[in-house]
Amino acid sequence: PEPIVKETVMSKLQGSVQIPEEFKFAENITFYTMLRNIFRGKNILVTGPSGCGKSSLGKILAGITNKEFYSFNFGDTMNPSAKLLGDTKYDKEAGTWFKPSRFVNAIQSNSFIMLDEVTRDRTGDLANILMPVLDGQKYLALDESEDSDSVSVNKNAFFYATANIGREYLGASHDLDRAWKDRFTGGIYELEYLPKQKEMELIMIRNPQLDTYNADKIVDFAKRVRDLHSADELTTAVSTRMCLAVSELVVDGMSLIEALKHTCLPFYPVQAGDDSERVRVIQVIQSMGD
């Protein structure tokens, strides 16, 4: 008799869910592993360079898993506790009262909660507040007192965190400590920029009117600049987000050279009279016209 093949969670996902066209993975198994972890309620952390698609991937995964999407960005606040917990308000008639945050409401439902740029918190409050939310305790204390009211986390709430880690990200911690990492039992995914062919496919899917010639030139430019960045000759790289911006300008009628200059040169300013980085990038841009 033929051996019985046991159907697993991974095989079911691979047989029933198509990889989204609007996002490209270097390896398809990454996508299905993420879906498996969402299905199992295992929080995941995605790291990688700015503009490689971490945040847009969160929205895509929320849609596929039919969860309500909430995003909380920690790069735009100096008070994480107010963003996560809420604020005390005062009204002449009602007196003092507590207004819960969006986060308090989000964790009580079947939601996909994106904790964006967690390494941008320099107060230390973020980790302290979120530890019991992300681990087995599954609760959020509304203040720091011992008898604080708390909110239980819905068993179907899922947490997806993103982090930019590295010297080039202003205000970002160098790394996440071990206690933080241990809370993401679904694993830590290190996204990199896509291989040239897949990045080209992505920008052509996002901008169907873009021709193959210009798509190839855009991703070739990005690869050359990234190689210079990897060799420590530039302090920052060209992101996929920047490639998409260039492609949109080209589709709208701007020349490729002008679109590259308009989008990319502001990331390489002249600093204290030193224009060496800008000159290098301009040279790469000009070579795209050859």
Task: Cite the ranges covered by each PLM segment.
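Alpha-helical lid/collar subdomain of P-loop NTPases
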Residues: 1-25, 40, 195-290
